[in-house]
Structures are given as structure tokens and as C-alpha cells.
């Protein structure tokens, strides 16, 4: 019997009006925004449904808005009787994954992400940096460049031939230049406010720790694939992993391959956009991907699994 994994996107997968159609059609989805707004202390319905996309450039609001939208869409999918065997999240998407797997409550997940966004924004102000996507080089080549240049690190293993690096601005610039000399197809600076998933934001991990340590994690109803370790992890590890992920690279490629190796044949992207689905097609063409961000795509998912 085929297995299903729900994938939850990370920062950058936002869009104006995200989640509105599903929330207005499915009461369980609207309840997520209402509970999340109270937990985060911001009006997530107004932010997601009506604010321009530019409002999401602030990581402090983008993170809770994105996770709330992913969890609202998850509730809509679950209302159709569809449940995953596995969950996996890209960066902040791990908080949505754990909420969807019912290891933590939805308000707790969104409240934690609000604190995470505040912590990351503060760390980025204290120790500025940047990120860039290196396209068309092997992982080993990019890793070697980072070791040689210093103060720049691999941050996201997105798919074969696409690694994001993170670090001090000059070091990231040098890495881009050297990557192109090594034959990279492109080196693209990302529109982010800090050097996330690098040691430069270690203070964010320190600030987030007390909030994470207050949370009681239950055994998940769907197996949790960590993108910190690219392994299945149990509830005893979640606190440390959610703190560690702030400074550790996102091993999405490795995690997706591990899930495919465990028999997952359908990957469902739960959240705005289809970034992860696009990456999956470059990781393993034998699996099926479905993105769900509106009612039409929800119906498509039902047809796919019928």
C-alpha cells in the first residue's frame, strides 16, 4: 500500500491572500487563524487574507502567518478524511509538521513560531548577514568553497544542484563569485533579512530555548522526519531539534530521499505555493507530488488518492 507524506514549506513560500479561500470554505481551517491570532498576538486573518505580499517581508510576521496557513490547509485536508503516514517540514515548516502530527497543539505551534521570528529578527540585527542560492554545482564543491572562504556555510540542501549558503555578507559574495568560476549556472542572492541556518544567528537559538522548553511534546500521530538529521525522530528529541535547526542546515534533499526509501509514493505540499513540489521533482521523479493551497487543489488531492 502506498504511503503519504505531508510536506510543510519554509520561509519564502508566502503570497498575498494565502489561505483565504480554504478558510472561508472550511470552518476547521478558519479556526486555525482565530486560535493562531490569539497565540501570536497579531491578526493573522488580516495579514494573510488582505495585506499585500510586501507585508510578509518581515520575518517576525511571515513565520507565524506561513505556519498558520499551512496548519489551516492541513485541517481542511484532514476534514476530508486524508491523513499522512509521515510529516516533514522545511525550516520553519517543521513547526507546522509537528502541529499537523498533533505532537503539539496548533496555538502552541504558532506561538512558538512567533517567538522564533522575533528571535531571528533580533539576531539578524545584532549580527547581519545574507544568503544566496548556488545553482548547478555538486554539494561537495559548494561545501569545499565554504570551508575555504570561511564565515559562510551550507544552509539549505534543497535538491541536487541547488544549495543555499548563509553567512557574513562579504563571504557570501565571495562564495557566489567563486561558485561561478567553478562552473555554477547561477549564484542568486536571496531576499532575506539575515544569515539564517548559520552560526551567525546562534543568539536566536539561545532566546528561543526557554519557550521551546516549556512545551510538552506528545508522540506524533504521523512519523516525523527531521530535516536537521534526515532521520525519523521521536518526541524526546523535538525540543533540541527545534533549537538546533536555527543554526543547522536544512537537509531537505536527504530527508526526501529517506522518505522515498521508506515507501512514500505521494508527497503532498501543505501550504502556499509549490516550491517543495518543484524540488521533489528534481530529487526523485518516481514519486507523485500534489500541492494544496486552495479548494481546487484540495479536490485534485482527493482525486489523486481516490
Residue spans for each PLM region:
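FabD-like malonyl-/acyl-CoA
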Residues: 2-141, 186, 190, 266-299
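Non-catalytic positions within long, well-ordered alpha-helices that form the structural scaffold/packing
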Residues: 78, 180, 260-263
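Short amphipathic alpha-helix with an adjacent loop that forms part of the alpha/beta core around
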Residues: 301-306
Amino acid at each position: 500500500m502506498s504511503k503519504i507524506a505531508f510536506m510543510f514549506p519554509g520561509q519564502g513560500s508566502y503570497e498575498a491572500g494565502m489561505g483565504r479561500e480554504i478558510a472561508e470554505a472550511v470552518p476547521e481551517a478558519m479556526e486555525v487563524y482565530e486560535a493562531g491570532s490569539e497565540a501570536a498576538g497579531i491578526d493573522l486573518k488580516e495579514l494573510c487574507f488582505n495585506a499585500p505580499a510586501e507585508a510578509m517581508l518581515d520575518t517576525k510576521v511571515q513565520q507565524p502567518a506561513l505556519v498558520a496557513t499551512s496548519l489551516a490547509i492541513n485541517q481542511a485536508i484532514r476534514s476530508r478524511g486524508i491523513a499522512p503516514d509521515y510529516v516533514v517540514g522545511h525550516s520553519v515548516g517543521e513547526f507546522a509538521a509537528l502541529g499537523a502530527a498533533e505532537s503539539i497543539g496548533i496555538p502552541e505551534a504558532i506561538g512558538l513560531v512567533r517567538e522564533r521570528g522575533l528571535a531571528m529578527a533580533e539576531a539578524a540585527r545584532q549580527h547581519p548577514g545574507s544568503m544566496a542560492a548556488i545553482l548547478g554545482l555538486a554539494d561537495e564543491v559548494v561545501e569545499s568553497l565554504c570551508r575555504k572562504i570561511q564565515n559562510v556555510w551550507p544552509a539549505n540542501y534543497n535538491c541536487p544542484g541547488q544549495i543555499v549558503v548563509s553567512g557574513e555578507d562579504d563571504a557570501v559574495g565571495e562564495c557566489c563569485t567563486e561558485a561561478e568560476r567553478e562552473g555554477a549556472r547561477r549564484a542568486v542572492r536571496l531576499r532575506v533579512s539575515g544569515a539564517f541556518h548559520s552560526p551567525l544567528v546562534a543568539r536566536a537559538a539561545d532566546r528561543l530555548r526557554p519557550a521551546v522548553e516549556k512545551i510538552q511534546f506528545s508522540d506524533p500521530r504521523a512519523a516525523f522526519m527531521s530535516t536537521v538529521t534526515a532521520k525519523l525522530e521521536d518526541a524526546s528529541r523535538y525540543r533540541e531539534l527545534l533549537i538546533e535547526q536555527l543554526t543547522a542546515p536544512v537537509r531537505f534533499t536527504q530527508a526526501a530521499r529517506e522518505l522515498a526509501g521508506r515507501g512514500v509514493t505521494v508527497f503532498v505540499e501543505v501550504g502556499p505555493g509549490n516550491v517543495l513540489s518543484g524540488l521533489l521533482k528534481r530529487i526523485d521523479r518516481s514519486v507523485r507530488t500534489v500541492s494544496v493551497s486552495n479548494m481546487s487543489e484540495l479536490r485534485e488531492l482527493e482525486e489523486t488518492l481516490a
